[in-house]
Amino acid sequence: VQSDAIVINQCEPFAWREFKRDSYRIRFLSCGERGVGLSRNTALMRAERDICLFSDDDLIYRDGYEEKIIQAFEDFPEADVLVFNIQSIDNKKSRYQIQKPMRIRWFNFARYGAARTAIRRTSILQHHLSFSLLFGGGAQYSCGEDTLFLHDCLKAGLRIYAVPITLAD
């Protein structure tokens, strides 16, 4: 990790730990609650920066990812949400690869997962958006929380763009 981070770990016992790694502030919350949507909402509520990146525990970020995200938001100042590429390791999981910058709309929003998504936190909070607690790993329905989140962003009128920048493997 080469940025400040909030890590939500779904395990017992409940614990909050904060530490520095290099010059970055890492906040680590362990809680027994289950559900990826709940974890993402918990992190979103505790975030202090305006630009936030959602992640999964199996990603390995490439050097300079923080600067790439900040630059992308500067390149798309009207964007509320940006979606990036994640490269599949050993082609075990095929992921849609963004080839050129484009606006995400109703006809193409369903192909992107939350782990490749960065947001302007103020836009999300102003529109009272959050991840569904019924969908996603650990919830009643085991997938779809990321698609519902992007759906809700579009419904709220947020501007979403896809950019051909790879952040992680």
What do these predicted regions represent?
Residues 56-60:
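The conserved acidic donor/metal-binding loop of glycosyltransferases
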Residues 131-133, 157-168:
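Catalytic beta-strand/loop signature of glycosyltransferases that borders the donor
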Residues 30-47:
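Glycine-rich, basic loop-to-helix element that forms the pyrophosphate-binding segment
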Residues 136-148:
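Acidic donor-binding loop at a coil-to-helix junction in glycosyltransferase catalytic cores
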Residues 52:
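Short aromatic/hydrophobic "clamp" motif used to bind/position activated sugar donors
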Residues 93-125:
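Short, flexible, basic/aromatic active-site loop/helix in glycosyltransferases
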